[in-house]
A protein has these predicted regions:
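Conserved FAD/dinucleotide-binding core of flavoprotein oxidoreductases
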Residues: 63-115, 133-147, 158-165
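Active-site-proximal substrate-binding core of FAD-dependent oxidoreductases
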Residues: 154-191
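A short, acidic/glycine-rich surface segment
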Residues: 55, 116-118
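Residue-level marker for buried hydrophobic side chains located in beta-strands
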Residues: 127-129
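Short, internal active-site loops enriched in acidic
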Residues: 4, 115, 177-178
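A short acidic (Asp/Glu
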Residues: 21-25, 140, 181-185
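Predominantly flavin-linked oxidoreductase catalytic cores and closely associated redox partners
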Residues: 1-99, 152
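A short acidic-Thr-Gly-centered motif at the start of a beta-strand
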Residues: 1-5, 118-125
Length: 191
């Protein structure tokens, strides 16, 4: 801890987001960068007034260097432009976003940087990475909540009653790799 306190546990679940405080910073598990397959690495988002055209679905629209989402909610509409900074700058991406929203913006646009990929191992030693600490696939298919839930279910199924069985750890990592790779390949098909 920052104050020098040491915390001991049989198992740590790293839910610390993109930083991966335990899995990456403490244990050094590397991140597999999948940007050569999924080049989008930034999103600019802005809420706007809800349109009278309230649709019960999310709309995804292709653009030159990425795509735009429109998510109608009860009191507003969520909008965002996901793009690759190798092919478009922020100013152009924001201009495209604001030109294609259905109402007046309710806030200033904000940007979110991300890198598509996953940790080489989601379970290493006595640490299991869940959620963004384990990996992120671009938001075209919103799989983050699914990956958290399936990771926890997988952990519960494979968690031994005492000690860590290397076969269970290996199986957890194998199943996690397979799931991330299947989702990655599905997203690639969109492009």
């Amino acid at each position: 801890m920052a104050d020098g306190e040491v915390i001991e546990a049989d198992l740590f679940i790293d839910c610390s987001g993109f930083r991966g405080l335990f899995i990456n910073q403490a244990l050094g598990v590397e991140f597999e960068d999948w940007s050569h397959w999924l080049p989008c690495n930034r999103a600019i988002a802005v809420p706007c007034e809800r349109s009278e055209d309230f649709t019960p679905y999310t709309r995804s629209t292709a653009h030159g260097a990425g795509w735009q989402w429109r998510i109608p909610l009860q009191h507003r509409t969520g909008n965002g432009h996901v793009f690759s900074t190798r092919f478009m700058d922020d100013a152009e991406a924001e201009k495209i976003l604001l030109a294609n929203i259905d109402g007046e913006p309710l806030a200033d646009p904000f940007k979110v940087d991300f890198k598509a990929g996953k940790r080489r191992q989601l379970w290493h030693k006595n640490c299991v990475a869940v959620g963004l600490a384990g990996g992120f696939l671009e938001p075209l298919e919103s799989t983050s909540l699914h990956l958290v839930q399936s990771g926890i279910i997988r952990l519960v199924r494979l968690l031994p009653d005492g000690g860590f069985n290397p076969a269970n750890v290996a199986e957890f990592n194998r199943q996690s790799d397979f799931e991330y790779e299947r989702i990655r390949d599905f997203i690639i098909l969109h492009y």
